Amino acid sequence: MRTPTFPATFCLVAGLCLASACGGSSGPGSVGRVAEAPDPAQAIDAALDAGTPAELREGLAAAIVIDVSGSMNDRVRGEDGRRTRKIEVARRAARDLIEQFVGYAEKHPGEPVMLGVYEFSRRSGQPDLRPIVQMGPPDRAGADEAIARLQPDGGTPIGQAMLAATQALNATGLTRRHLLIVSDGENTDGYTPEDVAAAVGRRPEGERPSIYLVTFDIEARRFSPLKDAGGLVLSAGNARELNQTLDTLITGSILVE
């Protein structure tokens, strides 16, 4: 595996994570909201135990989690230098990521490959983590329409999203797991990202997803506790940096030939 390199403006802090919302329900890999308990570590461990299949098999599974909280309506510098809404930048990035996974799966027909793409935010009456593309073999069919419907609103439950996405990865039974989160804000609701990352680190080696958090237009140093819990935190301040960071992660750490 080759070691990824990043632009100097990015902040690399080590380990696992990428940001979004939600806890899970009682079913394996379900996408929903986990009831918060006085002891977060115990509750998160129990949620992860409930979603782990009995048998593991070789293969690649990835969950891409995209922040759609209200601040994603704000603007950053786009690829063309104009001020562009963050959600529009995220939509384009999501389409590109799906294409990369489709291409990888086509080149490796004998390797099990599964991809799920999710949005997250805290909204009344909705789960924190919501599927854009259900976990399964990479497929571009219908993805464009689903991505086009992404709309910013609500809070930023990054830890809850991480937990629910990890449950979805657990349900695949595949041993090479990656959780990629893109968020432009700090955690506002539910479990903290560092509590979830710490729980992931307690899992058996074959059940631990690598977690990558890309902080979009927010300082990576705000996620120092996540770094201390074993996360890899990367910073991107505009559309070009975001695309470069995601491409380097995908080709250097996730879809490794």
Question: What is each residue range found by the language model?
Answer:
Residues 1-11:
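Bacterial N-terminal signal peptides that target proteins for export
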Residues 9-20:
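Bacterial N-terminal signal peptides
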Residues 22-80, 167, 255:
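Acidic, polar low-complexity linker/tail segments
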